[in-house]
Design a protein with these regions (language model features):
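Short, contiguous acidic/charged loop-to-helix segments that flank catalytic cores in large enzymes
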Residues: 407, 451-456, 564-567, 594-595, ...
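Pan-eukaryotic secretory-pathway lumenal catalytic ectodomains of glycan-active enzymes
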Residues: 535-543, 554, 558-561, 565-566, ...
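Extended, hydrophobic alpha-helical segments in both membrane/secreted and soluble proteins
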Residues: 168, 419, 432, 460-468
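Active-site His/acidic residue clusters
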Residues: 439-453
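Non-catalytic propeptide/linker segments at domain boundaries
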Residues: 56, 60-72
């Protein structure tokens, strides 16, 4: 447990900030809930009183979260008002489409029964985006970390569409020439950190895309991550060079579902998928077999130096999650775009919807209240006054608008709030897919670091481990499943990738120590993986006749040639999703790291929603979220099983752990006889009886690489870059 609450006081210099001192209040003094109101002495780095015996006055009080009447209660009823104290309220009468990957082929998903008596029916993200852009009549607004004009959205030869072979760039130019207002905001990465670029972490085509649309009717603005007004020169430099615009949204006007040809409505897309190269994939996640079809002109492999279609696979498959929002919630996404365009878009080119009010209907429900498929949805963000127009100026007004105040900065941190709120309400299980998993550094072991210097303070990992602890103490089952990539995209041996893996190890170790301590206190000697278990995704394919034959070969003795000969590679997990009890889901652009959860670092957007007729109140929820989770599990495991209906049960977690242990052995073995039967692999670490995260025997390095699975602390990269 953290032993002190630490108050840090710095001198606000124009360049940097000098530490004046820190004040400490022992946690023991506040846990009984008594209010503390007193002066506390300031100490230096070595815990000695600073000169002139300075003090600060603090007033604080602790409230035990388990005393909250909503703790562990789930959504409970359709009257659940949403996450409190946020910028956007929860909207009712919405419609949501959930997407696994950019595309799902016909007949991929087996029959998954839902409460309605129907079966789960998957949606197809890029086909729907193509239709939405093609059919827009007034405006198309897009924001992305990256937008690439040369990709095509429709690539399934069994599901052709009229005009489907057009590139995204040509499609947007065509729509703009028809009089549709096309506005694109993409992150300007010209200033981004060279340290990361050389490790293969950034390649966004921002300048190519800007040049492509020059002298066309499409308005494309490169958007730097500008700081708010409050920072020092160094802080401002950090924000503009180290942080990104990460929201991935499309907002269009759309036809009415009832066929009214005169009226239009708003439809929005929110999630993890950028409209750029390397993102199109299906749940098959092939490494070699699509290199002369869907991926011939879209070969993405940034983890090997010099990888190319000419040298052949494996390409890096891409697993991601996205959503389409209809009804009042779609307008909140539109308002977010307008706030950002007014702040950084330059010219005032936004369509004035007031002038179109006889055409575009005002925000109104997309579903009737008694429709069992209706959704309640809330929009969350990580963004600050440097990136969004019209934020209040004072801390008091900010608090009223559900915003928090930083150092002379107003911040929307509601994505983190939404995760924390959902974890605290959870009753039975949590299923997470995320590109990163690190944080709660205040609770990391202080062996070879000073946790207070790391500043990856977001609460999500600690909230998860404390939720499990509370359930162990109550004698109730609770399981957390987390899927992450093998390593963050980039050269796996590089300093930045190894540093992130090191933070991830410290995060997992902190969580496993919490779980093991709770089990021991109950006299249980159980495997902590029965409560908290981590996975990655990978594929391995035998060579088939008629496969694409590359004209060149990778360098000898490279990771690339080794992976090509072993016929294996990770499937990159880029999803940012959490499912709680099959009744509540969060989907967005935000990773589980400080950059995404901070609010004043990367800009992000996410939706959180549930179906009021499909709650886990008396029996398990069996609505769209349940169907979506089982669709994902089928994609990852290559099978479905009755135990999967109760993910919290020991039978389910034991079965999933056994299957994924076997799949990891097949993935990492020297020989290959058949395709891998599923993609979900045990994350290749062990957990000691004390909770230390260790190497799996024989797995110091990821297969085909010299990259350590447990990572390595970086001596030259500041934590602000890699957390």
């Amino acid at each position: 447990m953290a032993s002190n609450i630490v108050f840090t006081v710095k001198d606000d210099n124009p360049i940097g900030a000098t530490l004046i001192g820190r004040a400490y209040i022992p946690v023991q003094e506040i846990v009984d809930g008594e209010e503390i109101d007193r002066w506390v002495e300031m100490l230096d780095e070595d815990k000695n009183p600073i000169q002139s015996s300075s003090k600060i006055h603090v007033k604080l009080q602790y409230f035990d979260v388990t005393k909250d009447r909503n703790w562990g209660g789930g959504i409970r009823s359709a009257k659940y008002p949403g996450v409190p104290y946020t910028f956007y309220p929860q909207r009712q009468g919405c419609k949501v489409s959930l997407y696994q990957d950019a595309h799902v082929p016909d007949k991929f998903i087996p029959k998954i029964p839902l409460a309605s008596g129907e079966h789960y029916n998957p949606h197809r993200c890029w086909e729907d985006v193509f239709d939405s852009i093609t059919n827009a009549k007034h405006f198309i607004y897009i924001t992305g970390w990256s937008v690439y004009t040369e990709i095509s959205l429709v690539r399934d030869s069994r599901r052709p569409k009229p005009g489907g072979d057009i590139t995204l760039g040509e499609l947007l130019k065509k729509k703009a020439s028809e009089g549709v207002r096309v506005l694109i905001l993409i992150w300007d990465d010209r200033t981004s950190v060279d340290l990361l670029k050389k490790d293969g972490l950034m390649a966004t085509h921002d300048e190519e895309t800007e040049n492509y649309f020059q002298n066309t009717d499409v308005h494309c603005v490169l958007c730097p991550r500008n700081p708010d007004d409050g920072g020092s020169i160094v802080q401002d430099l950090q924000i503009s060079t180290m942080f990104t615009h990460h929201q991935k949204i499309v907002v269009v006007d759309s036809a009415m579902p009832n066929g009214d040809s005169q009226r239009r409505r708003i439809v929005s897309y929110v999630g993890g998928i950028d409209l750029c190269d390397g993102r199109y994939d299906t749940p098959f996640h092939s490494l070699f077999r699509t290199l002369d079809t869907a991926h011939h002109d879209d070969f993405h492999q940034p983890n090997f130096t010099g990888a190319s279609i000419q040298k052949g696979g494996p390409r890096e498959p891409w697993h991601d999650i996205h959503s389409r929002l209809e009804g009042p919630i779609a307008w909140d996404v539109l308002f977010n775009f307008e706030q950002r365009w007014k702040k950084q878009g330059g010219k005032d080119l936004l369509v004035q919807l007031r002038e179109l009010e006889d055409v575009i209907i005002p925000p109104s429900p997309a579903m009737f209240p008694d429709d069992h498929e209706t959704w309640n949805v809330q929009l969350f963000r990580s963004i600050d006054g440097g990136a969004a127009f019209g934020f209040p100026e004072t801390p008091e007004d900010a608090a009223k608008a559900g915003l928090v105040s930083g150092k002379d900065n107003i911040i929307d941190r509601s994505i983190q709030d939404a995760y924390v709120n959902a974890i605290r309400r959870a009753k039975n299980f949590i299923y997470i897919e995320n590109q990163y998993f690190l944080g709660s550094s205040f609770s990391w072991s202080a062996d070879d670091i000073k946790p207070e210097d790391i500043n990856a303070l977001h609460l999500i990992p600690k909230e998860l481990s404390l939720k499990i602890v509370s359930k162990i103490e109550a004698g109730e089952r609770f399981t957390v499943y987390v899927v992450v990539p093998m390593w963050p995209e980039g050269i796996p041996e590089s300093g930045s990738v190894q540093a992130i893996l090191d933070w991830q190890r410290r995060t997992l170790e902190m969580m496993y120590k919490d779980v093991i301590e709770a089990l021991r206190a109950k006299g249980l000697e159980e495997d902590p993986r029965n409560y908290l278990t981590f996975f990655c995704l990978g594929n391995r394919e035998v060579k088939k006749s008629g496969e694409y034959e590359p004209s060149e070969k990778p360098e000898p003795d490279s990771d690339y040639i080794r992976a090509q000969e072993a016929r294996r590679f990770m499937i990159y997990v880029h999803a940012k999703m959490m499912i709680v009890d099959d009744e509540y889901i969060i989907i967005g652009s935000a990773n589980i790291n400080q950059r995404s959860m901070d609010g004043a670092r990367d800009s992000e957007i996410a939706m959180g929603g549930y179906q009021p007729y499909h709650l886990a109140t008396r029996q398990p929820a069996r609505g769209q979220i349940h169907g979506f989770r089982l669709g994902l599990w089928y994609e990852h495991l290559g099978m479905l099983d009755d135990t999967f209906l109760h993910p919290e049960s020991e039978e389910c977690v034991t079965k999933v752990n056994q299957i994924t242990d076997k799949y990891w052995d097949l993935y990492s073995s020297e020989t290959l006889e058949h395709d891998l039967p599923g993609h979900l692999l045990r994350y290749p670490i062990g957990v000691s009886s004390e909770g230390n995260v260790t190497e799996l025997p024989g797995t110091e390095f990821f297969p085909d690489t010299k990259a350590r699975v447990l990572g390595a602390k970086s001596d030259y990269m500041p934590p602000i870059l890699t957390t």
